[in-house]
Amino acid sequence: MSYLVCGMIEYLMEQRSDIEADLKSIGYEVGIKLLELCNFEREVRISTLLYRATFDLLSLVSDSDRRVEKARDVDRTYLLTDSDGLFSRFISVPDEWNGLSADSIVCGMIQAALMASGYDSEVTAFPEPSENLPNRVIFQIRILDL
């Protein structure tokens, strides 16, 4: 799957479009199909929904250490930390596209799970490498309506 996403990113870079928005929309479509594969049911509680999206849905794409937590300062915002982002691991971004996160496709998958349960959301991927975790990605999940 990483090879496919790498090809999509290369194509989108040639088009000079909004790559992250395009990756999110592609991820949304992939997420809908993955929801069908894992028999995803509508969840009412946001904490249960985020848990299932993180450990049931995303485990179909990659198997890495993940953690979900509520943001301390901001209301209706959650942080999903992926210690080894699948697409960040295999795709290197040129220097001129420094802020680009190849894991934006996962944002669309998370949004699909939230939308399937009736939650409108905005998900953003931030690469946060550290010395021990060079491919760590933090997904900021903002619930727009409750």
From Swiss-Prot:
GO terms, biological process: endoplasmic reticulum to Golgi vesicle-mediated transport
Keyword Transport tagged: yes
A Pfam family reported for this protein in Swiss-Prot or TrEMBL: TRAPP
UniProt source species: Encephalitozoon cuniculi (strain GB-M1) (Microsporidian parasite)
Stated role: May play a role in vesicular transport from endoplasmic reticulum to Golgi.
UniProt protein name: Putative trafficking protein particle complex subunit TRS31
Gene3D superfamilies given in the database record: Trafficking protein particle complex subunit 3
Record key words, sorted: Endoplasmic reticulum, ER-Golgi transport, Golgi apparatus, Transport
Family: Belongs to the TRAPP small subunits family. BET3 subfamily.
Domain of life: Eukaryota
UniProt subcellular location: Golgi apparatus, cis-Golgi network; Endoplasmic reticulum
GO cellular component: a single term: TRAPPI protein complex
Quaternary structure, from the entry: Part of the multisubunit TRAPP (transport protein particle) complex.
Keyword Cytoplasm on entry: no
Gene: TRS31
